[in-house]
């Protein structure tokens, strides 16, 4: 009888075990204007840039049941979309996708680099928010 109880407890524990999955890596970068000047106080997701235009969004994780993860046999995809906005500038969406990114270890990072916000001057009203322009690093 005692062996049955221990066996049932062990199976229950194994089936309810959780593992940590990534829902958003730590995202960091700098927001600049079209003249390559840093922009302070830009809303980036749930945070704001400092006066040098730098920002950092914390990593987000969630717990997933081991049994469910075993059935899929691969790490889940990660899709992140964060809105950047500042009065006087055209808002944009920063997007990140990794087809198996949910399996990354704790401490995952995405260093974006420089993101260019365009001034609202001489722009017509848009129904859709465009993707952000990311300035690539010169080699």
Predicted regions and their residues:
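Bacterial N-terminal signal peptides that target proteins for export
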Residues: 1-7
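Beta-strand-rich domain onsets/edges
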Residues: 8-26, 30-33, 121-139
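Short, ordered, surface-exposed loop/turn motifs in non-cytosolic proteins
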Residues: 24-28, 33-48
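Beta-strand secondary-structure signal
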Residues: 28, 56, 81-83
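Solvent-exposed strand-loop boundary residues in beta-sheet-rich modules
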Residues: 35, 50, 88-90
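Short, acidic Ser/Thr/Gly-rich low-complexity loop/linker segments typical of extracellular
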Residues: 45-68
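A short, solvent-exposed loop/turn motif at the edges and junctions
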Residues: 67-102
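Extracellular beta-sheet/turn segments enriched in Thr/Pro/Gly and aliphatic residues
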Residues: 96-139
């Amino acid at each position: 009888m005692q062996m049955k109880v221990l066996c049932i407890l062990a199976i229950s524990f194994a089936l309810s075990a959780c593992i940590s999955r990534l829902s958003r890596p730590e995202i960091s970068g700098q927001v600049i204007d079209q003249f390559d000047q840093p922009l302070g106080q830009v809303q980036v997701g749930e945070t704001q840039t400092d006066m040098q235009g730098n920002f950092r969004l914390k990593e987000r994780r969630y717990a997933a049941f081991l049994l469910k993860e075993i059935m899929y046999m691969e790490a889940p995809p990660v899709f992140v979309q964060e809105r950047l906005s500042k009065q006087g500038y055209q808002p944009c969406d920063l997007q990140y996708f990794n087809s198996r990114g949910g399996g990354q270890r704790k401490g995952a990072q995405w260093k974006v680099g420089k993101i260019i916000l365009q001034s609202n001057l001489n722009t017509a009203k848009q129904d859709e928010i465009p993707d952000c322009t990311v300035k690539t690093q010169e080699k």
